[in-house]
């Protein structure tokens, strides 16, 4: 599985000849090293409607013909903008043929716009199972104990986990998430984009490895094959 970190919570995952794009916030992202018109995808998985996650979804989906996977309300919003969608809801699992997706809970919010905002359903995370591996992108979330249950049902190979605090888990809570999920690998996200989510990634790396998890810290634009 080839994973490219695009900055913040955005990732491009490639496996089985398919491209999965998570939370493609590129325009306005101080960490991004790539423009929206330089990327294509078969599927875009959007965890919630905040601008730093919904990001460039519409432009990329319209240009590439990608199908957006997310909660029902978010997909309804995107369908009105001529975007192909596959609506789901938390706890739902769907077999797309070459891969399966399960939506997981996330403790956060989800709305779009300034001034009067549009409610876009509950935030979520994703369990993507493809090519014999399962990747868990938690979305923006605080720590919750049912992460353990999720991983008991679908053992996780790769965990993409926020560590920046303030809006999500911080390093301390993300380390507890490692104990609950017990992934083989973990990649930190959602940190150091702005000062309010500054985090010591070295601490997460050292303490995570002490728990027996292979921690892969990626710079924006960097890729790893797992």
From Swiss-Prot:
SMART domains: Lactamase_B. The keyword Hydrolase applies. The keyword Transcription regulation does not apply. InterPro entries: Metallo-B-lactamas, RibonucZ/Hydroxyglut_hydro, UPF0173, UPF0173_UPF0282_UlaG_hydrolase. GO terms for molecular function: hydrolase activity. Coiled coil: none annotated. It comes from the Bacteria. Keywords: Hydrolase. Belongs to the UPF0173 family. This is UPF0173 metal-dependent hydrolase CHY_0920.
